[in-house]
A protein has these predicted regions:
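Bulky hydrophobic segments
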Residues: 7-148
């Protein structure tokens, strides 16, 4: 008999295993590296300007993709269409490059940041989403073979 505790533990374990992949770890580590070098007043020139913007959209899309795959679909067959990922990029650009520069001193309106948001979205669509979808599908197939 399956207890609630065992079910919650298996869902949590699955969420961690699917979420933490090489791309997600790269996004988080690069963001931490850029924030750390900014804090030390020793920014890395090219990376400081656009890497955090590049990884922001894939980071958000990946977390939403994993949660959506675990909650709403079975087998990892779901994938975001390109227009949804570009919509995420557009909304991110509007908020961080359109509205927030008028209300905060930290944000600046920069066209290259907008390009970085869209490049990150295209990267997620072309590379990372396929990687994660295959990973979820394999885990689902493994689970089906174990239950037989």
């Amino acid at each position: 008999m399956c207890s609630r505790r065992r079910f919650n533990r298996s869902v949590f374990r699955s969420l961690i295993l699917i979420t933490l992949d090489k791309y997600f770890i790269f996004y988080c580590c690069s963001w931490l590296l850029i924030r750390y070098t900014r804090k030390l007043h020793f920014p890395i020139p090219l990376l400081n300007n656009w890497l955090t913007d590049f990884v922001f959209v894939p980071l958000i899309a990946h977390v939403a993709f994993v949660l959506g795959s675990l909650i709403f679909t079975t087998g990892g067959t779901f994938k975001y269409p390109i227009y949804q990922i570009l919509s995420i990029s557009l909304l991110t650009a509007l908020v961080f490059e359109g509205f927030l520069p008028y209300y905060t001193h930290y944000n600046t309106a920069d066209f290259y940041d907008v390009l970085a948001y869209f490049a990150g979205g295209v990267f997620y669509y072309a590379v990372h989403q396929n990687h994660t979808s295959k990973k979820i599908r394999k885990a689902f197939e493994r689970k089906l073979s174990l239950s037989k």
